[in-house]
């Protein structure tokens, strides 16, 4: 392996169940530090479930069972001694639809910081500005920080949610189809943002958009489901190889549009 490729997250034989219903089975892959990894595959193949297992947010959806290991910089996140709140600060999440809180733009970004630390106002102001700049939103909102976040456009709201995640300085950012509800211009801005953030963050993104996966990611994992196995990872590799010369015929059929 290239010495520059350092895994931020190592997934080993991961299976996940909602109650007794299996959602993903036997997933093993690395998510490399300061790289973008795309998770692709047809609907119902476990992409979103998988990404939610990486910071244990899936547990908020009801009784679950986990088998296998998710190693985050040397620690199994499913170790019972893990501090889940600290884990979720280190591995942030951006969801499919923008979910700004019904409060001001400023307070949306400051929210997570206020929960985790009591800071002087000047320090908080600096963090909010830095996060909004990191999300490429500062110039658009700097004169209306006290206005409701609900008045922003859909694309601005999604970048605000990214800023909210950035404010608590995560090491990894998980993105679950972050552009599916956005128009092409807003999508382009989010993709540009992903490119700019990769130098600071490790990013994993679920997407149905094959073109988006080729544009933004360094590595791609293809998930699928068949009659014998549900929620399996068929193939993982460098994005250019996955899309131009996949090793598995199922991957080839999917990326060429023959199914899915």
Curated annotation (Swiss-Prot):
Chief place where the protein resides: membrane
Entry keyword set: ATP-binding, Cell inner membrane, Cell membrane, Membrane, Nucleotide-binding, Phosphate transport, Translocase, Transport
Membrane topology: Peripheral membrane protein
InterPro entries on file: AAA+_ATPase (IPR003593), ABC_transporter-like_ATP-bd (IPR003439), ABC_transporter-like_CS (IPR017871), P-loop_NTPase (IPR027417), PstB-like (IPR005670)
The organism's place on the tree of life at top rank: Bacteria
Binding, ATP: 41-48
Catalytic reaction equation(s): phosphate(out) + ATP + H2O = ADP + 2 phosphate(in) + H(+)
Domain ABC transporter as annotated: residue spans: 9-255
Catalytic class of the enzyme: translocase
Pfam entry (one): ABC_tran
GO biological process: phosphate ion transmembrane transport
SUPFAM superfamilies xrefs: P-loop containing nucleoside triphosphate hydrolases (SSF52540)
SMART domains: AAA
Keyword check for Cell membrane: yes
EC number: 7.3.2.1
One GO MF term: ATPase-coupled phosphate ion transmembrane transporter activity
Cellular component aspect of the GO annotation: plasma membrane
Subcellular location: Cell inner membrane
Functional summary from the UniProt entry: Part of the ABC transporter complex PstSACB involved in phosphate import. Responsible for energy coupling to the transport system.
Family membership: Belongs to the ABC transporter superfamily. Phosphate importer (TC 3.A.1.7) family.
Subunit structure, as described in the record: The complex is composed of two ATP-binding proteins (PstB), two transmembrane proteins (PstC and PstA) and a solute-binding protein (PstS).
UniProt name for this protein: Phosphate import ATP-binding protein PstB 2
UniProt organism field: Nostoc sp. (strain PCC 7120 / SAG 25.82 / UTEX 2576)
């Amino acid at each position: 392996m290239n010495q520059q490729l350092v895994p931020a997250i190592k997934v080993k034989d991961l299976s996940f169940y909602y109650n007794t219903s299996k959602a993903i089975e036997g997933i093993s892959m690395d998510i490399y530090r300061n790289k973008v990894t795309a998770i692709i595959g047809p609907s119902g193949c476990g992409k979103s479930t998988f990404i939610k297992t990486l910071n244990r947010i899936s547990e908020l959806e009801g009784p679950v069972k986990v088998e296998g290991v998710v190693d985050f910089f040397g620690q199994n996140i499913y170790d019972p001694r893990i501090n889940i709140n600290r884990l979720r600060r280190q591995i942030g999440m951006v969801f499919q639809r923008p979910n700004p809180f019904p409060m001001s733009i400023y307070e949306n970004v400051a929210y997570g910081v206020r929960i985790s630390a009591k800071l002087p106002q000047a320090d908080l102001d600096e963090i909010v500005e830095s996060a909004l700049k990191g999300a490429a939103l500062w110039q658009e909102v700097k004169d209306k920080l006290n206005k409701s976040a609900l008045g922003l456009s859909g694309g601005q709201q999604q970048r605000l949610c990214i800023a909210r995640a950035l404010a608590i300085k995560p090491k990894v950012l998980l993105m679950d189809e972050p552009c599916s509800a956005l128009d092409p211009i807003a999508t382009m801005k989010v993709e540009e943002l992903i490119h700019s953030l990769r130098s600071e963050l490790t990013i994993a993104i679920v997407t149905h958009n094959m073109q988006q996966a080729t544009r933004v990611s360094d590595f791609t994992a293809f998930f699928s489901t068949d009659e014998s196995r549900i929620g399996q990872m068929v193939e993982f590799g460098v994005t250019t190889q996955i899309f131009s010369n996949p090793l598995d015929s199922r991957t080839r059929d999917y990326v060429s549009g023959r199914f899915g």
